[in-house]
């Protein structure tokens, strides 16, 4: 019996379903958000790159609702028919890793789609579209609920997005012939840096520690200032 009129409906938190028949309400013929859930047209797209399973990649599109909440639509190409792939927004960048901030709707491998309404994190902290664009996080999608260790797609979001500014430095061969490469520094929206080491000639199975040292090579050895991720010779 709650009264509601035109203005109230324009701000109503709701959606409309049309069903196949009175005997088959489970089959929807049409559906759409209304009121506060209407999309404003403002969106932001992030790439989700291939990880442990070759051939799977896609995008995560964040869309603003009139209410300020966000609709997150993930589309992955290459997922297997019948596969069910859990997904989460995590704290920190993908390079740093972090705990789960928000559980996303499980992605259906047959459609390659996951759609999630977000107005709060798992712990109840309120967050909407604008907050997500500045969030210190990344997205993971996993092979299955029983195999979360195997990632099918991953991508940084929010303040961890790369600006496109980068600088590459050559790493020359030293004590082991045939090993050389580059160190690429990329700027994030936050002002932080993603450092990617691309080394050629490393032995399969080798695990090679790396650091940024103080001073110039000519003045080595300098103190270790920053420990970098260990280089996996197999990759």
Which residues fall in each region the model found?
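N-terminal leader/targeting pre-sequences
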Residues: 1-235
């Amino acid at each position: 019996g709650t009264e509601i009129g035109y203005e109230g409906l324009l701000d109503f938190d709701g959606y409309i379903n049309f069903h196949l028949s009175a005997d088959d309400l489970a089959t929807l013929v049409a559906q759409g958000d209304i009121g506060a859930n209407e999309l404003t047209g403002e969106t932001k797209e992030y790439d989700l790159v291939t990880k442990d399973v070759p051939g799977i990649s896609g995008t995560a599109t964040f869309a603003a609702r009139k209410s300020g909440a966000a609709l997150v639509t993930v589309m992955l190409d290459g997922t297997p028919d019948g596969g069910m792939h859990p997904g989460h927004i995590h704290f920190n960048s993908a390079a740093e890793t972090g705990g789960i901030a928000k559980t996303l709707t499980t992605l259906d491998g047959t459609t390659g789609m996951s759609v999630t309404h977000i107005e709060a994190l798992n712990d109840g902290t309120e967050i909407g579209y604008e907050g997500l664009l500045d969030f210190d996080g990344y997205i993971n999608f996993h092979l299955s609920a029983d195999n979360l260790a195997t990632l099918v797609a991953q991508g940084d979001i929010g303040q961890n997005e790369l600006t496109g500014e980068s600088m590459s430095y050559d790493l020359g061969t030293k004590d082991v012939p045939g090993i050389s490469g580059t160190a690429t520094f990329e700027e994030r929206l936050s002002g932080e840096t993603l450092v990617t080491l691309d080394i050629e000639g490393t032995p399969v199975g080798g695990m090679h520690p790396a650091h940024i040292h103080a001073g110039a090579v000519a003045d080595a050895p300098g103190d270790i200032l920053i420990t970098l991720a260990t280089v996996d010779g197999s990759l």
